[in-house]
């Protein structure tokens, strides 16, 4: 079964919609739980999550009283120190499923994503992601989205989500918590080195909000600089300093 791990920090505009999307596009028989790991949100993220938990619990209870099958996976809200790597590792420690599925709060996976993931694992593909589509019609972002169909390391990123068996995740040692940013790519690099990565061709839809905030070309330039900084041996601290100065 799959444990979904969602790191959040001030995601009041997305988290409620994402949780409903997960319910509507998966089967409870395949999902152990949905772990939402909050890194100290100061907006209404936690209140929204708690409301979804309460409403879901009440709906399931009413259905059971009527003899109807309305099973939904449990949502577990946990608090962790801020930092996606720390939050996702914390969630993984509390996961009961044999497959971990790491998902950003502004990324919406395809219908039956759970079945698609399980099918790949059953084929022996122990880690991978979905092909990604930005919610933007800007030509460069459409091209960048199209390129994610290829299993190339340079086209990978956390907004495509990440599934991995818990055994493999633990063998690698989880996400490197030295990386405040770029943590997804560090794990992905290790998976490519082990030849343990597959791209599922169904699309996950992800927000282009960072591009809208900074401008497409400006942000793409900074991401490219970060990529080459890591390629040429920059430390996690150096990468974070650059990110904090130009993107955060």
Predicted regions and their residues:
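Short aromatic/hydrophobic "clamp" motif used to bind/position activated sugar donors
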Residues: 100
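Conserved donor nucleotide-binding strand/loop of the catalytic core
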Residues: 32, 46-56, 73-94
